[in-house]
Every structure is written in C-alpha cells, then in structure tokens.
Amino acid sequence: MPTPSHLSKDPRYFDFRAARRVPETHAWPGLHDHPVVDGSGAGGGPDAVPVVDMRDPCAAEAVALAAQDWGAFLLEGHGVPLELLAGVEAAIGGMFALPASEKMRAVRRPGDSCGYGSPPISSFFSKCMWSEGYTFSPANLRSDLRKLWPKAGHDYRHFCAVMEEFHREMRALADKLLELFLVALGLTGEQVAAVESEHKIAETMTATMHLNWYPKCPDPKRALGLIAHTDSGFFTFVLQSLVPGLQLFRHGPDRWVTVPAVPGAMVVNVGDLFQILTNGRFHSVYHRAVVNRDSDRISLGYFLGPPAHVKVAPLREALAGTPAAYRAVTWPEYMGVRKKAFTTGASALKMVAISTDNDAANDTDDLISS
C-alpha cells in the first residue's frame, strides 16, 4: 500500500517498508567500536547469558549471581502460558502492520508518555532509530488504544483482551520475582514476608508496556533499532520474538553479547532504580537492539517501577552494614537527572550517588515514602 503523500512529508513518520537504503537521518556512527559475541553459551565460554529457572529450588542463588554480574538474565519456568505469549506476539505484529494513516492517529505528542512513534528515548538524539513503538499503561489500556481504534471494533477488543490477560499474568509474575530478588539479597522467606518495605513496593509497583517493531533493514551495519541505554525503573521483562537482536554490554574486555532467542523464555533487565534500591548490589544493564537484513523483529518491554510520588532509596536490608550509596529520588526526579545525563554524557546514577555518612543516614529512612 503506498504511503499517503501527507505522511511521507511528516517528520514523525518514516516508511521502513519502502526504504532501499539507510538515509543519513538513520545512520549511526560508532556502532562497531566493540566486538559482538554470541551469548547462547554454545562455546561454553564466559559470555553465556545466565538462565534462571523459577522452578529450581536454587533460583534465588542464580538470580543473585546474574543480577550482581550481568544485571540481566533469561527467565524460564515463569508459568506464563506459551499460547498467551504467542498470542501477544501475533497481536503486536498485527498492530504494527496497520496502515500508517491509522497508526498516526495515535502518534505520541511532545510531552506525552503513551502512544505510537519512535522510542521515547529518541528525543535525546539527533539520529533516528530503525524501529516503531507503541507505549501504554495497562491501567488505561482501553482508553489509550481507542486512539488507534476509535471505532472499538473486533480488532480493538481482541487486542485489549490479549494485553489485559498478559498484564494479569505479568503483574503476578512481577510480585514473585520481587520476592525472589529479596531472597537473593540474603533474606529468608520468613524475613521477606516480614519486610514492610517489600509489601509497600509490591502493593504500589506500577507497570508500563512498550511494544517494539524492528523492520528488516537494507544496511543493518549503519542502522540501530534502539540506542544503548539502561532502563530507569525497578526491573523489566522483555518478551522477544525468535529473531535475536537484544545485546547486553559487558566489560573486561568491552563487548556486546547477543541474547539468544529462546522459545518461551523472557529476558529480565535490572533497572537504575533497582540498583539504587539494592544499594548497588544488583546493577542495571546497558543494552541495545540491533536490526538485520532478512527479518523483522518484535519485542515487548513490561516495565515495573514506583508511583511518581514515591521516593526510592537503598533498602535497609541491602546495606549490610555499609552506608547508602545513593540519595532518595522519585522516578520523575530521576528521569530529570537522566535527561541531563543524556545531554552532557554523564552517568545518571553517579549524579544521584552520595558520599557522606550523614547523607547516607538520612536517605536510608526514605526507602519508599510519600
């Protein structure tokens, strides 16, 4: 279907399907400054992405090792039905296959967090990414998606039903993983049940869903699906199709590790606020999405974080006799810090780090407060 002429001139829209080359607007320098290695573990080396099976009695130990060393892991045995995951992927593919004129009805406006368009992070960069995205809050799913399907017909009802079922499953899984993370910090099951802050986090944790479509690219060596970044919230579940493209950054030596596309598995990324919450014992992971010449790729990020008014600081249970490494911040405050970091090249986490014992003593009382 040809692109309407008014859309072809709209700077917010790029017709990836019609592209025969990568224009300068989408060409990124420095993509190959570091080598890329296989993370499947086929060679038995140190770059195998960790796997956590929630059915394993030693799952908490595996989470601790992965969160401390990698900041990410593949999650198996999570209990989310495979047929639901397949339905979610099919629904996402169908949504991005809609005509451009229909998708543009839901375009994300400046200052908005929800809607269709480029990744939200793209506003910080002069180059464009080889991807389309759609962001919505599960709490407002039906009203958000009416922008895309104003007549609320069959496609709208089916998409909403699939995403609502997925949200129910994922929200329950998030609570289980939060408990596993706390056990990984060294708490027993009984101690976790008694931690007041754990209940506050579980009860107030909010979710956001971001859908991604990475079209096949005529010159993938020049383009990038999603710029390298860390997630800002607590932790993220990533559901990806069976086309690899997610890469994690590793030091010593610096390299990109391609996460294998394992049927039924999800990727879990530790976010910046969870690094703060655990006082740096679990660290966020720098990651990106690359594109390829032969296949489209679909992914879904299910992001968990605190409500906007809640201050996040290191858990007392994570300190283990050490001073707090970070000051208390709300999520919006931290996003403001990240904006400065993007424009200056600084580290947002370093910008909220604290160094004095007095500051540390004050901030540990603020773990999760209004």
Swiss-Prot record:
<keyword id="KW-0408">Iron</keyword>
<feature type="active site">
    <location>
        <position position="297"/>
    </location>
</feature>
<dbReference type="InterPro" id="IPR005123">
    <property type="entry name" value="Oxoglu/Fe-dep_dioxygenase_dom"/>
</dbReference>
<feature type="binding site">
    <location>
        <position position="231"/>
    </location>
    <ligand>
        <name>Fe cation</name>
    </ligand>
</feature>
<keyword id="KW-0560">Oxidoreductase</keyword>
<comment type="similarity">
    <text>Belongs to the iron/ascorbate-dependent oxidoreductase family. GA3OX subfamily.</text>
</comment>
<dbReference type="GO" id="GO:0016707">
    <property type="term" value="F:gibberellin 3-beta-dioxygenase activity"/>
</dbReference>
<dbReference type="Pfam" id="PF14226">
    <property type="entry name" value="DIOX_N"/>
</dbReference>
<dbReference type="InterPro" id="IPR027443">
    <property type="entry name" value="IPNS-like_sf"/>
</dbReference>
<comment type="function">
    <text>Converts the inactive gibberellin precursors GA9 and GA20 in the bioactives gibberellins GA4 and GA1. Also accepts GA15, GA44, the 2,3-unsaturated GA5 and 2,3-dihydroGA9 as substrate. No activity with GA12, GA53, GA24, GA19 and GA25. Also possesses 2-beta-hydroxylase, 2,3-desaturase, 2,3-epoxidase and 13-hydroxylase activities.</text>
</comment>
<protein>
    <recommendedName>
        <fullName>Gibberellin 3-beta-dioxygenase 2-1</fullName>
        <ecNumber>1.14.11.15</ecNumber>
    </recommendedName>
</protein>
<dbReference type="InterPro" id="IPR044861">
    <property type="entry name" value="IPNS-like_FE2OG_OXY"/>
</dbReference>
<dbReference type="GO" id="GO:0009416">
    <property type="term" value="P:response to light stimulus"/>
</dbReference>
<keyword id="KW-0223">Dioxygenase</keyword>
<dbReference type="GO" id="GO:0009686">
    <property type="term" value="P:gibberellin biosynthetic process"/>
</dbReference>
<dbReference type="InterPro" id="IPR050231">
    <property type="entry name" value="Iron_ascorbate_oxido_reductase"/>
</dbReference>
<feature type="domain" description="Fe2OG dioxygenase">
    <location>
        <begin position="205"/>
        <end position="306"/>
    </location>
</feature>
<dbReference type="InterPro" id="IPR026992">
    <property type="entry name" value="DIOX_N"/>
</dbReference>
<feature type="binding site">
    <location>
        <position position="287"/>
    </location>
    <ligand>
        <name>Fe cation</name>
    </ligand>
</feature>
<dbReference type="Pfam" id="PF03171">
    <property type="entry name" value="2OG-FeII_Oxy"/>
</dbReference>
<dbReference type="GO" id="GO:0046872">
    <property type="term" value="F:metal ion binding"/>
</dbReference>
<keyword id="KW-0479">Metal-binding</keyword>
<feature type="binding site">
    <location>
        <position position="229"/>
    </location>
    <ligand>
        <name>Fe cation</name>
    </ligand>
</feature>
